């Protein structure tokens, strides 16, 4: 497996891998990483579909990429913010047929939609019960805070192992709009991994200027289950891939001899019946280890979601622990799943039932939410919320079967253990109705109307996810297994807890990248895997981000010590009349 960039590799079709007709594949899980692996086995690996078996413990595919209507109402556990430089994602989705537009791909639909209706937030944050917080596109960070960010950007990864963000930043960063934007957009907490924070900065340096108003982002038409998962599953079924639902993989055994590692068997359980499936070197095994939505609990309008981080037999954490016990190269799951109080947050899906609540939404987002176009344009953060509440409406309808007079709102709170500002209870102890009341309070609904609207004008379903931020926990090298560990001959790890270079977790791209790299490595496919977009090596992006992070202030306006000011003045003299001076002026750096 090797990385590439450019159209030469991107548009090429690889030759059929040697011996692939004699191979089969077992894929544990049906999340985005697993489905991506299956799609690449079919498209580029040219494996027969009936040789591919997707094993899923739940009754539906998709993993964390969900969006369903239950008896209790619509539920979206999360949402996906996407980037034009998700290179693997677009490499695959260009080949997945649309379910709605004949002759078009999922990428075509997505591209046309975001061209016609580009994303932009008109109100990034509120305070004082629905008043615009007037962040006004500003990062509001001091020169000292900017230097802390720059220092992290250039700190070697080796020095950031097991470090927290609080080990690097202080209140110069934490009190800024920058941190409010960052932590709520990506769900970072102050105690999370400084290494991952650095990777994010480098990965999305080209989008720094688009963070305050979300012009950097793109979204799907519907929820991600309907817009991404269903087309992928349909593509796979059309190629004969087998899906086994409500089937747990409770154990994987490995034969490890010298430097060679082979997955030798998997134990599956279906309807209480357990079976051991032996594996040969020609049986490829793809393992989704860990899981950000494991142990999640769903509430209802009149029921709290609760908080139960118990790791149950057959879930992703339990399986990874059994696997990790067999070899040090298989990672250290305890680094991620041992402190659920530090890795949880709670979300809720609020469905409006009449025209009473939408007027308050419209006042804040400054758009009509019923047009089918962009509404909030990303999350609206309630700056003075004790839960640090954020909420969003993507294009409506979010579900194909959603009534046209209803809206589906996604709400989440980073601090599920704190009492609310109106409902004096921790979010995790609140029913859907109570979470809706807290949200309505922060929308600016008159207090005398809040209970009535939460009761009769909305249906709210909360979801508690104890491990949703587990991948952000401080880590060291080796805590996540390599996608294909050294010496592995027939297995690979997939998803957010598998290790690949430079990319960032909690993204669709990371999951899909692990799936592509796993297949390309095990089948030795002779085509390049698209490298992570290289904006971190592009001096144009670096200078542009530096200026925009400082709200347009020039380098010459920095609060520098006397000696550094003199040095800068001398440098500017040296470059006078050169292309370098012209370049810096073009990007408003001087």
Where would I find each of the regions flagged by the language model?
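Rossmann-like flavin
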Residues: 99-206, 217-219
């Amino acid at each position: 497996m090797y990385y590439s960039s450019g159209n030469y590799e991107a548009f090429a079709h690889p030759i059929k891998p040697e011996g692939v007709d004699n191979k089969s594949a077992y894929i544990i899980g049906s999340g985005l990483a697993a489905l991506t692996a299956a799609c690449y086995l079919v498209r580029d690996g040219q494996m027969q579909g009936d040789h591919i078996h997707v094993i899923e413990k739940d009754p539906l595919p998709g993993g964390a990429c969900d969006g369903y209507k239950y008896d209790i109402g619509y539920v979206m556990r999360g949402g996906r913010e996407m980037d034009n430089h998700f290179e693997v994602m677009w490499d695959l989705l260009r080949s997945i047929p649309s379910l709605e537009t004949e002759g078009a791909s999922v990428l075509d639909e997505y591209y046309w939609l975001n061209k016609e209706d580009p994303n932009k937030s008109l109100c990034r944050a509120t305070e004082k019960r629905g008043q615009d917080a007037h962040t006004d596109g500003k990062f509001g960070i001091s020169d000292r805070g900017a230097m802390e960010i720059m220092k992290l950007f250039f700190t070697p990864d080796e020095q950031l192992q097991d470090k927290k963000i609080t080990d690097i930043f202080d209140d110069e960063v934490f009190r800024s709009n920058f941190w409010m934007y960052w932590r709520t957009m990506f769900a970072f907490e102050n105690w999370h991994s400084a290494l991952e924070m650095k990777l994010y900065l480098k990965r999305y340096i080209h989008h720094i200027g688009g963070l305050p108003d979300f012009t950097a982002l793109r979204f799907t038409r519907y929820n991600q289950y309907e817009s991404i998962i269903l087309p992928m599953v349909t593509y796979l079924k059309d190629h004969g891939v087998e899906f086994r639902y409500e089937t747990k993989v409770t154990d994987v055994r490995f034969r490890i001899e010298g430097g060679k590692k082979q997955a030798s068997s998997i134990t599956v359980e279906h309807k209480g019946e357990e079976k051991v499936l032996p594996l040969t070197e020609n049986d490829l095994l793809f393992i989704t280890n860990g899981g950000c939505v494991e142990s999640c609990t769903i509430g209802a309008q009149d029921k709290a979601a609760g908080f139960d981080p118990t790791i149950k037999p057959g879930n992703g954490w339990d399986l990874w622990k059994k696997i990790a016990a067999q070899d040090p190269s298989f990672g250290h799951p305890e680094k991620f799943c041992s402190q659920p109080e530090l890795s949880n947050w709670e979300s809720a899906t609020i469905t409006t039932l009449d025209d009473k609540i939408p007027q308050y939404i419209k006042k804040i987002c400054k758009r009509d939410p019923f047009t089918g176009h962009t509404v909030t344009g990303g999350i609206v953060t309630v700056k003075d919320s004790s839960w640090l509440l954020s909420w969003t409406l993507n294009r409506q309808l979010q579900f194909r079967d959603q009534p046209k007079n209803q809206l589906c709102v996604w709400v989440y709170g980073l601090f599920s253990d704190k009492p609310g500002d109106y409902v004096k209870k921790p979010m995790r102890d609140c029913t859907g109705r109570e979470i809706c009341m807290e949200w309505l309070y922060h929308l600016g609904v008159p207090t005398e109307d809040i209970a009535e609207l939460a009761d009769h004008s909305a249906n709210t379903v909360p979801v508690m996810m104890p491990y949703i931020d587990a991948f952000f926990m401080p880590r060291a090298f080796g805590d996540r297994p390599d996608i294909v560990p050294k010496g592995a001959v027939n297995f690979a790890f997939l998803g957010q807890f598998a290790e690949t270079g430079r990319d960032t977790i909690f993204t669709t791209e990371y999951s899909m990248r692990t799936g592509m790299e796993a297949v390309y490595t095990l089948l030795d496919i002779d085509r390049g895997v698209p490298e992570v977009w290289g904006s971190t090596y592009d001096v144009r992006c670096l200078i542009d981000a530096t200026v925009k992070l400082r709200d347009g202030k020039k380098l010459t306006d920095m609060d520098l010590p006397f000696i550094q000011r003199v040095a800068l003045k001398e440098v500017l003299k040296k470059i006078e009349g050169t292309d370098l001076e012209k370049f810096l002026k073009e990007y408003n750096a001087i």
